[in-house]
A protein has these predicted regions:
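Carbohydrate transferase catalytic cores enriched for Leloir-type hexosyltransferases
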Residues: 1-368
């Protein structure tokens, strides 16, 4: 299993690679799992999970190898990582392999094909070309939802029996934060009023300028709008929308949060609002549910599948309608209680143990 993404990413593909690797050991039985990564700078990955052997390439930088793969299709990945019955690449793309080597690739979503305007231009051309090559050469494709499986079959022209949807898991949270400590953490972030929360990388699919517009329409809410997430790509429209908003003083953009701060944010949120345009899975609202926060979400892409009946849904992108729906939810304590309870139950269905078990079953089908 290639775990390069786990070196530098706390969220997204990095989290997927780390969590899956950590839980696969329990499924392996007599089989051996090896995790491979480039470690030219000697950063290391720490102690391996039980049942996993770590393999690192320390004589060749990963970036150099990536350029060789892009330009020459050489050297084969297995020359560097060692022999295996099956190779799993969890980050969209299959690098070159020697003839006859079997591979599985996780393509988390195909938003860059469905909505190319939301993707960085420097990555779009290469990724769009490489993903077709990957889909053709991989023995099987994993993806995060049934929605994404349909998208992959349609946009990459892949046979139905080659694509396998496997839901992702949620981390096992510790106990809820101490109320006084959580309140102190929120105060340190300048939050003493009620607030609406959105968590996610700042990028076009998250539709944050529209979220700002919703907040502007929700004039009878005198609390804050909190957007927690690192800067991604094409952030200009989002940053301008915040800077030019007549309610800009109430908008908090929090870019670098530790786990304790994020837990405190969830604990104090009046509601989680998610007007995203496209999701291959939708971690943030599911995480909010697991923390007992009522979720108000766009009804599109994978979200109805993942969130089920536990969210308050809004169809389309009319800011007045969104403000009306949020107002209705916040003003109905019974509804808020139902959403909290339903969200907590829904979140229980998503565990990394289940993800690893289903992934291992697919490995078994293709490794021999």
């Amino acid at each position: 299993m290639d775990i390069q993404a786990a070196l530098g990413q706390r969220a997204g593909v990095g989290r997927y690679a780390r969590e899956l690797l950590w839980h696969l050991g329990a499924e392996a039985g007599s089989d051996e799992i090896a995790a491979f990564y480039f470690d030219f700078k000697r950063r290391g990955m720490g102690a391996p999970p039980p049942g996993v052997q770590m393999r690192a390439c320390r004589w060749l930088p990963g970036r150099v190898t990536q350029n060789l793969w892009k330009r020459l299709g050489f050297p084969p990945y297995d020359w560097l990582a060692g022999d295996a019955d099956l190779y799993h690449f969890p980050n969209f793309v299959r690098p070159p392999l020697s003839k006859g080597k079997k591979s599985i690739v996780t393509i988390h979503d195909v938003s860059f094909l469905r909505m190319p305007e939301t993707t960085e231009a420097k990555n779009l051309a290469w990724l769009s070309a490489e993903i077709h090559n990957t889909a053709r050469k991989a023995d099987a494709i994993l993806t995060d939802s049934y929605f994404s499986a349909r998208e992959i079959r349609e946009l990459l022209n892949v046979p139905e029996d080659k694509v396998f949807p496997v839901w992702l898991g949620l981390p096992k949270w510790g106990p809820p934060p101490d109320p006084e400590a959580a309140m102190a953490a929120r105060k340190s972030l300048g939050l003493e009023n009620p607030y609406l929360l959105m968590v996610g990388t700042i990028e076009p699919r998250k539709n944050i300028p529209f979220l700002v517009e919703i907040y502007e329409k929700f004039t009878d809410f005198d609390g804050n709008l909190v957007i927690a997430g690192g800067l991604g790509w094409k952030t200009g429209p989002t940053l301008r929308a915040i800077a030019e908003s007549p309610r800009k003083d109430g908008i908090k953009l929090l870019k670098h949060l530790g786990d304790a701060q994020l837990a405190a944010l969830y604990a104090g949120a009046a509601a989680f609002v998610y007007p995203t345009r496209y999701e291959g899975f939708g971690f943030p609202p599911l995480e909010a549910m697991s923390r007992g926060v009522p979720v108000i979400s766009a009804k599109n892409s994978s979200l109805p599948e993942v969130l089920g009946d536990a969210a308050e849904w809004v169809e389309g992108f009319d800011a007045e309608e969104w403000a009306r729906k949020i107002r209705k939810v916040l003003g109905d304590s019974d509804r808020m209680t139902r959403l909290r309870a339903a969200g907590l139950e829904r979140a229980k269905q998503f565990t990394w143990e289940k993800t690893a078990r289903e992934t291992w079953e697919i490995y078994r089908r293709f490794k021999s």
